[in-house]
Amino acid sequence: KDIADIQWAVGSDIDYVALSFVRCATDIEEVRRLVQRASVSSGKRCVVKLIAKIESARGLANVDEIIREADGIMVARGDMGVEMPIETVPIAQKSIIRKGYLAAKPVITATQMLESMIENPLPTRAEASDVANACFDSTSAVMLSGETAMGKYPVQVVRTMRSIIDAVEKQFDYVDFHHDIPPEVKTGDIPAIMSYNAVSVAYLCNAKALIVLTETGHAARLLSRLRPRMPIYAFLSDERLFNQLALNWGVRPFLHSGTGTRLDVVVDEAIAICKRSKLLAEGDKVVIIAGLPLSQQGSTNMIRVETIQ
């Protein structure tokens, strides 16, 4: 059945597949091979990304290799609380979130976040604190399950979670977070250095936004892990990647025409899209991150500051 489900996911252009009870990197490698075979047999590009659910003691013990191999991580606290002592779950959650963002991989915190709202129109204070603390830990996303799948107040629970997230993000110390320098910056990785310095420049010039031109989404993910105060507008020409980037913290993806090969042409198109969307106005400063030549993957090597005309 798992093979049939993977074949269906590939054939249906599903963006992410979540794997339950991942024990080690080999589990992910095996599913990735199945995805590749299904892509070949269906004549589609192999673009499905894999999210590893950490919900067992063995998975937690091997979390570093799992994060390296997966495209994203889910902290599945329900089964985790059954598989290991309950008092270790909050500690594991914080550790996984930190490891995930340092690896520039999105982390989803899930299970029983607003559980009481299955039956009640308001959450408990403890549940509100649970959602807030996951956000303060810098999780990429928080996920509802039974609350919206079978609860009495599915719309209200989403609004409640949204309001908690908004309140936290108004209090989040983004500048202090930026001082937590990623390890690749210290070891000389050029794209990591460029992303870190782009955010530094954005703070120094009080930029309204970061605009990143990306072919693979990697540059946008590197910016996302730095949790900048200003939004990240990612411009790309691949529709599947456009959908997948929506999971990354602070990233708002946009599709551009993909016809421009000169930097100025693509930047002008990106700025025009932002102005039409009323995201940028005359006088706003933006920091632009790109790689030259534009069509070359993994070449992030340019930072530019522009004032919107």
Please provide the spans of the model-predicted regions:
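Non-catalytic helical/linker scaffolds that mediate oligomerization, partner binding
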Residues: 1-309
